[in-house]
């Protein structure tokens, strides 16, 4: 009795010294022997390694060049803003040589549009990253043609009425939106990220 109490006292005070549980075997007549083993739970540290593949420089350059198409075509909407704030034109002086070269080519806008759509968007040899950026730029360029069509249809006139002021506000808003999309697309492409322009990205994604 004393030895039993001593063994129980050692087990309670030092659990590590307690004997390990042995598997319990149950044998039934005419059947196999079942062995029940105690489950041991061990805390395992899960290490998640995030694989990151940087975007190649060529894909970034093509994406940046794609967003230049709608931006160049949207400069015509900024004429009222530049006339009211001439100093804003100084910010765009570095791109004037490229813009003059772009406008010196006959039908440069149509050539760039179809070249970008057929040569990049529909070219499966390019990655989805490049094709999506190109399609988003093409979609934005198509949307930029809508204000011109509305202006020709409505014909606000040359006076200082409400129609003319509405056209000026609309053109200025279109230019600001296009400029923000251009900056957003260029910065995202430089960082190797995918820019998602509201409404435009959904329409571009459905075309791929």
From Swiss-Prot:
UniProt KW tRNA-binding keyword: no
Listed transmembrane segments: 61-83, 101-121, 134-154, 172-192
GO biological process: protein transport
Key words, A-Z: Chloroplast, Membrane, Plastid, Plastid inner membrane, Protein transport, Transit peptide, Transmembrane, Transmembrane helix, Transport
Topology in membrane: Multi-pass membrane protein
Entry keyword Protein transport: yes
Membership in a protein family: Belongs to the Tic20 family.
Task performed by this protein: May be involved in protein precursor import into chloroplasts. Not redundant with TIC20-I, TIC20-IV or TIC20-V.
Protein name from the UniProt record: Protein TIC 20-II, chloroplastic
Natural source organism: Arabidopsis thaliana (Mouse-ear cress)
Lineage: Eukaryota, Viridiplantae, Streptophyta, Embryophyta, Tracheophyta
Gene for this chain: TIC20-II
């Amino acid at each position: 009795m004393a030895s039993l109490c001593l063994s129980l006292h050692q087990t309670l005070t030092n659990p590590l010294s307690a004997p390990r549980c042995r598997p319990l075997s149950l044998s039934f007549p005419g059947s196999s022997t079942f062995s029940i083993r105690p489950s041991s739970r061990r805390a395992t540290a899960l290490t998640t390694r995030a694989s990151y593949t940087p975007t190649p420089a060529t894909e970034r350059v093509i994406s940046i060049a794609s967003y230049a198409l709608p931006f160049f075509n949207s400069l015509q909407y900024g004429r009222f803003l530049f006339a009211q704030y001439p100093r804003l034109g100084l910010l765009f002086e570095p791109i004037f040589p490229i813009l003059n070269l772009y406008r010196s080519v006959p039908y440069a806008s149509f050539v760039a549009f179809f070249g970008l759509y057929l040569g990049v968007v529909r070219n499966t040899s390019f990655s989805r990253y490049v094709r999506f950026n190109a399609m988003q730029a093409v979609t934005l360029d198509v949307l930029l043609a809508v204000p011109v069509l509305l202006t020709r249809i409505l014909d606000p006139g040359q006076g200082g009425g409400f129609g003319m002021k509405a056209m000026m506000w609309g053109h200025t808003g279109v230019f600001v939106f296009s400029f923000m999309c251009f900056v957003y697309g260029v910065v995202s492409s430089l960082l190797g990220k995918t820019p998602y322009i509201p409404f435009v990205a959904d329409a571009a994604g459905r075309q791929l």
